[in-house]
Amino acid sequence: MPNKKIRVLVAKPGLDGHDRGAKVIARALRDAGMEVIYTGIRQTPEMIAEAALQEDVDVVGLSILSGAHMALFPRVVQLLRDSGLTDVLIVAGGIIPDEDVDTLHEMGIRGVFGPGTRTDDIVGFIRENVS
């Protein structure tokens, strides 16, 4: 199916209640022709992994501003793997210190985008990395 739309789950793990950035990204991905499932705020890692499995997504995008990324993201990645979703592209955005980026890449988060990243850059990254 060469013209299959890329399916992206956009999720806000943890107690972070600020979702403006996630909604901007979700809109940009939709405008770029992708199918977007937005889970809303205050999602547990288990809820995110279950939604990714149920929705048969190509990409999981995690948005966080609370600083809890090093606690929450590894759990999401592990649950996705445990669910058999080993080929899903995982990306993350939000307030993520530069010193954490390499560790996030090592755990399987392929793209990490900070404040001010152009939406076109995120769209391009997803298109280039979804097989």
Please report, for each region that a protein language model flagged, where it lies by residue.
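Cofactor-cradling patches in redox/metallo enzymes
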Residues: 22-127
